[in-house]
Amino acid sequence: VDIIIREARTEDAAKLIEYTKLVGAQTDNLSFGKEGIGDTPEVEKEFIKRINSDPKSVMYFAWKNDDIVGCANISGMKRRMSHRANFAISVAKSEWGCGIGSVLLEKCISFAKDNGIEIINLDTRSDNIRAISLYKKFGFVKIGRMPAFSKINGEYIDADLMYLDLREKSNNRRKMEAFERLEAIRRENKDEVDFNKEREEAINKKHQIQPQSQ
């Protein structure tokens, strides 16, 4: 069965609520449980409208037949933090290991690059090895750990804080240009460098103590 990835629409609100109840019951890695997000279709419609009207926010759904089996969103920030966005993702347990998470994350990163987002932030349970491995594969870096980030059945759960710096390619380009400039200078000064080296070797040879003849 083909998986279809597309942006959220207001008419998806009821399906989204069903999906959050499903995934909430399947894992403790989310901020909600089997109750789902607890909103009505009307509230979710307004939520989707707000996302779709924000040029720096997006929500993607992965569809299998007529059901949502994956969800990811980029939430743009405002004013002096408008270069940043928060990221969240979930996938139905039946689809774990099928690559849906990678496709959704790739879509969100592409959206961020196309819409002027330079930094993507996320948080994830520190023991969620599967998710952390996925994020690292796409270049996310751990920048800290927050203790007692969530509390489930009386147990405190730590979270890793991670980010993806989309400026990295431009930084690497600048580093490469600087390296090329240094190489050009080195080539221009090669004759002088070789001369100095020969002079140093000659001086060392001149002052070298010769073994006495028997």
State where each predicted segment sits:
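Active-site acidic-Proline motif in GNAT/NAT acetyltransferases
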Residues: I89-S94, C98, S126-D127
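Conserved GNAT acetyl-CoA-binding A-motif
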Residues: A112-D123
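Helix-loop element at the rim of GNAT/NAT acetyltransferase active sites that forms part
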Residues: E18-E35
